């Protein structure tokens, strides 16, 4: 994505080219890929161009979802929280088109943040808190968001967030967020997947792995790639066969309702 590079015009042109290429790849390999688009975001700019591009991708090219960057500045967090009404016209369009958004930042520019560790996982956690403390899911009850990397720190600290929601008078956390937020399985050790599948309901977990990801090496303890997440899901004692099928396939088909059957 690279939303921190250039200006709004740069992002617009780059995004359109990237989305056209995504459509081309999906046409070349229709049994391997379905298209999800990036949006032409740029720090502190109107969200209208993202709405136009989302409609182009979904209505004209058959895309089934989008990626939403909560911090186009690359770590300086210049834009408003995801619960702010700045985002509402985009959320309205997502609901109108019935497409989910993956919440995912791009490269880190802030010298205190490493892109694929502190920035990614911190942004995942921050996005969750934005939604938890806002009225987004009340105002848009059908909206769907996927938080990657197993939700950042969220499942590990579910008790903290439950307690905060309770103290703030927000009600039961599960009821407040789990109708709209889903977590992927880009978690690179067995204990992490075990914890995710124990804390988060199966209905809210979507399978994910990497093509070129944050960790590319082989774990010397297991002899397998760190990001071979299917192995962890197959091995966890917290799922039966029916639940594994939900994680591997069923949940994604439900969340990405435009997925071609």
What residues fall within each predicted segment?
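Generic hydrophobic alpha-helical segments
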Residues: 50-54, 133, 193
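H/E-rich (His + Asp/Glu) clusters that bind or coordinate divalent metals
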Residues: 112-132, 140, 144-261
């Amino acid at each position: 994505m690279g939303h921190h590079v250039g200006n709004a015009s740069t992002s617009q042109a780059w995004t359109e080219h990237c989305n056209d290429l995504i459509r081309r790849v999906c046409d070349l390999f229709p049994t391997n890929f379905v298209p999800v688009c990036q949006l032409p975001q740029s720090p502190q700019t109107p969200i209208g161009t993202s709405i136009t591009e989302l409609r182009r991708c979904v209505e004209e090219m058959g895309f089934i979802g989008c990626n939403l960057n909560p911090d186009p500045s690359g770590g300086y967090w210049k834009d408003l929280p995801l619960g702010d009404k700045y985002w509402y016209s985009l959320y309205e369009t997502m609901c109108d088109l019935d497409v989910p958004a993956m919440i995912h930042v791009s490269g880190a520019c802030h010298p205190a943040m490493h892109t694929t560790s502190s920035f990614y996982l911190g942004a995942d956690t921050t996005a969750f808190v934005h939604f938890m403390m806002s009225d987004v899911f009340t105002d848009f009850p059908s909206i769907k968001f996927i938080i990657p990397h197993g939700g950042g720190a969220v499942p590990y600290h579910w008790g903290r967030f439950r307690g905060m929601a309770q103290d703030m008078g927000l009600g039961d956390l599960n009821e407040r967020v789990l109708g709209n937020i889903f977590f992927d399985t880009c978690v690179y050790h067995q204990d992490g997947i075990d914890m995710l599948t124990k804390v988060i309901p199966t209905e809210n977990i979507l399978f994910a792995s990497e093509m070129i990801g944050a960790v590319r090496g082989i774990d010397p303890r297991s002899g397998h790639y760190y990001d071979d997440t299917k192995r962890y899901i197959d091995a966890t004692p917290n799922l039966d066969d029916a639940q594994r099928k939900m994680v591997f396939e069923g949940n994604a088909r439900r969340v990405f309702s435009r997925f071609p059957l």
